Amino acid sequence: MNLQHHFLIAMPTLTDPLFKQSVVYICTHNHEGAMGIVINKPVEQFTVASVLHKLKIIPIVDHASVQLNQPVFLGGPLADDRGFIIHTPKDGFGASIGISPQTMITTSKDVLETLGTHNQPDDILVALGYSGWEEGQLEHELRANTWLTIPANNQILFATPVSARWQAAAKILGININNIVNQIGHA
């Protein structure tokens, strides 16, 4: 099982504050473990414009299709001082890895320097930190029904309102995740 370019959808029983009602985009998954970015937990009052200001990058706003007021996300509890940019494919960035034909992840700031130019990716999602699983850990969590999984899509990743991503991802499976109960009983 390879869940690269899939979403993990937190089950309602997951109560850890970092992952409660979360959607995680899996960037890599192999025999060594998995790495993903939470895509629906924005950092309060921190936007792409804030990141650019902090990095002393002055965006060119005359051609900006990327919204500078979009939120920055808490991608997970690991390396939360590092930036990770998920974006639609565009060549020429220093530290990029292809996730799928529709998405890449970049950890170098050169992708941010292209915002507002014809070299910018069509869509971006900026996160601080990432979520990681050691070998076998994610598989164990899946067997414990901690997560639902679906193939990822760019509509949810980039265009769905942040507050609706958890429900929208579950809806692809044909379920209303709000109707799943947190407890089971015995007859």
Swiss-Prot record:
Pfam families, per database record: DUF179 (PF02622)
GO cellular component: cytosol
Family under the similarity heading: Belongs to the UPF0301 (AlgH) family.
InterPro entries found in the cross-reference section: AlgH-like
SUPFAM superfamilies, alphabetized: VC0467-like (SSF143456)
Annotated HAMAP family: UPF0301
This protein's name: UPF0301 protein BCI_0481
